[in-house]
UniProtKB/Swiss-Prot annotation:
This is Membrane protein insertase YidC. Belongs to the OXA1/ALB3/YidC family. Type 1 subfamily. HAMAP family: YidC_type1. Its main location: membrane. The lineage of its organism: Bacteria, Pseudomonadati, Thermodesulfobacteriota, Desulfovibrionia, Desulfovibrionales. One of its GO terms (molecular function) is membrane insertase activity. It comes from Nitratidesulfovibrio vulgaris (strain DSM 19637 / Miyazaki F).
Length: 539
């Protein structure tokens, strides 16, 4: 009975995983926007912001007379680094393009670089400043006297945009660095006349970051509240708007692999507003009232991230931005697995081979447990004649039959569930690797065998995507059948039927799984078959 329950538990664990993915795709949880007839006020537009208190970096000392402001004609400003190419508009520093040099939209030759900004999101400003709830890039006049930036390794540069918005002189200083995707902003505010109090907000926005993500990758709004990661994926929820208050570290729009985030330096009294509208995902981190003394100046700062969810770089970012890489409940397993994959990849240069090496290591770790389990199955095989007699003798009295069976197991020191232990132990590793493959930017477009042998057909060129020809899941199912042939058949007819259908169920489940995960399970099956064969020969 215990063995039967354990096997059913294993099957249910995998069914839950697939069922969740199915529901996410078919019940409107996929982050795809529904069309809207008209464009209304977006949630990040601050007309609904409640007044809040906030500490400011104020400099009340008198300063020189404000120079005459001369608006300039709008033009494009370009920032080029080894990591990206950014194009901004001088009218308020609106971001028009942010192309990632090292990441392509597809694995095909000539595919364009991933652009974190699209035309629709440019209208709503993916790198904007809200003043009194209004978009400063639309309501003010701006000037820019600088030039383009071209940054080499280790270099940084500053673009300064000056404007007059709602009676306030606004100076936006954006600092770009060649070695990170972090953009740092300092906003200097000075009243044109008397002391002023304004409400300030930092906004980021983008289009769909996962156009080809399918049911496993959705664009969503996420945030870190009091050190705890939260997100909303449902398109219907995002269209209604998201409002969060409290100890917020950052707000973001993200997919499995890419991140657009705003992280105010001073998070006191910050409110997050998020919304999906007209195909644009937008987040605003809005502050409370900012006091600007007459003749003085107030400085407020914010950091932005436009780029991949690169663990190494995000670890160096402020406001715990590294928590944007959320690996779920199995993160304690997934993170070491990613580290091991990186270690192997550093030496072999192929993530498919790295997964195979990782599988071998995991198999060696679990070898003693597997060995004990297979011995238990062999003992169960020897007990089958006695178990069959008990069934015939107590067939009408299941309670008595189970009692006699347990006495028999105890006499021969056999654990009826022992044969299931290797699979049960591997389930956390399976889910950990599943999360790692879905969320590790290192594995996006990572190849194993790029073409089918002796053909030009692209095959396992992206281990984070499914096998396009379903070869690996079918072979994996065949190895499960072979493994069953080497395993003693369960005495319970119901249990035997469940085991018979397991390879079929697993094969269909794995058809849409990332091919890297299928390679792991296939390799694990082959090693298990080799171990069983070795034990049978030894016996």
């Amino acid at each position: 009975m215990e063995s039967k329950r354990a096997i059913i538990a294993i099957a249910l664990s995998f069914v839950v995983l697939v069922g969740w993915s199915y529901l996410a795709d078919h019940m409107g949880w996929n982050g795809q926007p529904a069309p809207q007839a008209q464009q209304e006020e977006t949630a990040p537009s601050a007309s609904q912001a409640a007044p809040q208190s906030a500490s400011q970096a104020a400099a009340p000392a008198p300063r020189a007379e404000t120079p005459v402001f001369l608006p300039s004609a709008g033009r494009e400003v370009t920032v080029v680094t080894p990591l990206y190419k950014a194009v901004l508009h001088s009218g308020g520093g609106v971001l028009k393009h942010f192309s990632l040099t090292r990441y392509r939209t597809a694995i095909t030759a000539g595919a364009p670089a991933v652009d974190m900004v699209d035309t629709a999101s440019t209208v709503m400003s993916p790198l904007g400043l809200l003043i009194n709830g209004q978009p400063s890039w639309n309501t003010g006049q701006w000037s820019f006297d600088g030039g383009d930036l071209s940054l080499g390794a280790g270099q940084s540069g500053v673009l300064t945009f000056t404007g007059e918005v709602d009676g306030v002189r606004v100076v936006r200083e954006l600092t770009f660095s060649a070695d990170t995707y972090l953009i740092s902003e300092k906003v200097r505010l000075a009243p044109l006349a008397d002391a002023r109090t304004v409400r300030l907000g930092f906004t980021v926005g983008t289009g769909n970051l996962s156009p080809n993500g399918g049911q496993y990758d959705h664009t969503r709004v996420a945030w870190l509240h009091d050190g705890s990661f939260s997100e909303k994926t449902s398109a219907s929820d995002l269209e209604k708007g998201v409002l969060e208050t409290g100890a917020l570290s950052w707000g973001a729009v993200m997919s499995n692999y890419f991140l657009v985030a705003a992280a105010p330096v001073d998070t006191t009294g910050v409110t997050l507003k998020g919304k999906l509208q007209e195909g644009v995902y937008r987040v605003a981190m809005e502050r409370g009232d900012v006091s600007i003394p007459a003749g003085g100046e107030t400085t407020v700062a914010c950091n932005y991230w436009f780029g991949p969810k690169d663990r190494g770089l995000l670890k160096e970012a402020p406001n715990q931005l590294a928590e944007a890489i959320n690996l779920g409940w199995f993160s304690i397993i997934a993170r070491p697995l990613v580290d091991m994959l990186e270690f192997f990849h550093k030496y072999v240069g192929n993530y498919g081979v790295a997964i195979i090496l990782l599988t071998v290591v995991i198999k060696l770790v679990f070898w003693p447990l597997s060995h004990k389990s297979y011995k238990s199955m062999e003992q169960m095989k020897k007990l089958q004649p006695m178990l069959q007699k008990l069934r015939e003798k107590h067939g009408d009295d299941r309670e008595k039959m189970n009692e006699e069976m347990m006495r028999l197991y105890k006499t021969y020191k056999v654990n009826p569930a022992g044969g299931c232990l290797p699979m049960l132990v591997q389930i956390p590793v399976f889910f950990g690797l599943y999360q790692a493959l879905l969320n590790a930017i290192e594995l996006r477009h990572a190849s194993f065998i790029t073409h089918l042998p002796f053909t030009d057909m692209v095959w396992l060129a992206d281990l984070s995507a499914k096998d396009p020809y379903y070869i690996t899941p079918i072979v994996m199912g065949a190895t499960m059948l072979l493994q069953q042939k080497l395993t003693p058949a369960p005495g319970d007819p119901t249990q035997a039927k469940i085991m018979m259908f397991m390879p079929v169920v697993f094969t269909f489940m794995f058809l849409s799984f990332p091919s890297g995960l299928v390679v792991y399970w296939l390799c694990n099956n082959v090693l298990s078959i080799a171990q069983q064969w070795w034990m049978l020969r030894k016996a």
